[in-house]
C-alpha cells in the first residue's frame, strides 16, 4: 500500500487540532478522554502522532475531533464552512 503525503505529512488537520487543543488548555490526554467519553477509542499516543502529521486521520474521526474541540469539521480539514446565500423564491 502506498501512503500519500502532502508537505511531508499524513494528514491536513493535525496542526489545527494542536492549535485548538492548546488554546483550550487541554493536554493530549484530556483530548483523548473527551473523545473516549463519546465511546470512541483514541489514545494520547494516537493524538500525538496525528498532531505531528505521522498518522492518517480517517474521515470518520474528523467529527470526533470537531465535537471534542467544539469546531467546525470543515475547518479542521482546511475548508471554510459553506456559505449559504439566498435561496430560490
Where do the language-model regions lie?
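Hydrophobic micro-packing sites on short alpha-helices
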Residues: 31, 61-66, 76-77
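Residues that mark the N-terminal boundary/hinge immediately upstream of a DNA-recognition element
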Residues: 16, 27, 43, 58-61, ...
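Short, charged recognition helix plus adjacent turn
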Residues: 1-8, 67, 74-89
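Short alpha-helical DNA-recognition segment
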Residues: 25-49
Amino acid at each position: 500500500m502506498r501512503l500519500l503525503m502532502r508537505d511531508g505529512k499524513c494528514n491536513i488537520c493535525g496542526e489545527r487540532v494542536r492549535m485548538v487543543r492548546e488554546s483550550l488548555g487541554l493536554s493530549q490526554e484530556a483530548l483523548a478522554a473527551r473523545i473516549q467519553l463519546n465511546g470512541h477509542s483514541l489514545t494520547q499516543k494516537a493524538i500525538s502522532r496525528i498532531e505531528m502529521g505521522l498518522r492518517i486521520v480517517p474521515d470518520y474521526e474528523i467529527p470526533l475531533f470537531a465535537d471534542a474541540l467544539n469546531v467546525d469539521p470543515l475547518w479542521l480539514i482546511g475548508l471554510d464552512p459553506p456559505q449559504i446565500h439566498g435561496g430560490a423564491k
